[in-house]
């Protein structure tokens, strides 16, 4: 049983690195360091893979809770369909 759990964990880790590109998913949360994030975004040492999206964005991208550096929307901003951080009021 423990071998199955270990193998599953390793496969999940490899999959998350391949999908996430070692720092983001789907074109955001890149490897850029502090000061290199796009407008309305901040660098986070541990939240780069899991993003907050506007309610009308369906389906939501996969969020794997593995600590990864990357750019995330500032407080009060959410990602729209174009993956740009916009004020919550402009989600549409």
From Swiss-Prot:
The keyword Ribonucleoprotein does not apply. PANTHER family: ACCESSORY GLAND PROTEIN ACP62F-RELATED (PTHR23259:SF70), RIDDLE (PTHR23259). This is Allergen Api m 6.03 / Api m 6.04. Disulfide bonds join 37-71, 46-67, 50-63, 54-91, 73-85. The record marks 65-66 as: Reactive bond. Keywords: Allergen, Disulfide bond, Protease inhibitor, Secreted, Serine protease inhibitor, Signal. InterPro entries: Ser_inhib-like_sf, SerProtInhib-TIL_Domain, TIL_dom. It is found in: Secreted. The keyword Signal applies. Residues 37-91 form the TIL domain. Expressed by the venom gland. Residues 1-21 form the signal peptide. It comes from Apis mellifera (Honeybee). GO terms for cellular component: extracellular region. One of its GO terms (molecular function) is serine-type endopeptidase inhibitor activity. It holds the Pfam family TIL. Belongs to the serine protease inhibitor-like (TIL domain-containing) family. May act as a protease inhibitor.
């Amino acid at each position: 049983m423990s071998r199955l759990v270990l193998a599953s964990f390793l496969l999940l880790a490899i999959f998350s690195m391949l999908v996430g590109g070692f720092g983001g998913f789907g074109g955001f949360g890149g490897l850029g360091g502090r000061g290199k994030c796009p407008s309305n975004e901040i660098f986070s040492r541990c939240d780069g893979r899991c993003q907050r999206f506007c309610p009308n964005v369906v389906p939501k991208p996969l969020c794997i809770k593995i600590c990864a550096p990357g750019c995330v929307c500032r407080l009060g901003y959410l990602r729209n369909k174009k993956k740009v951080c916009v004020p919550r009021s402009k989600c549409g």
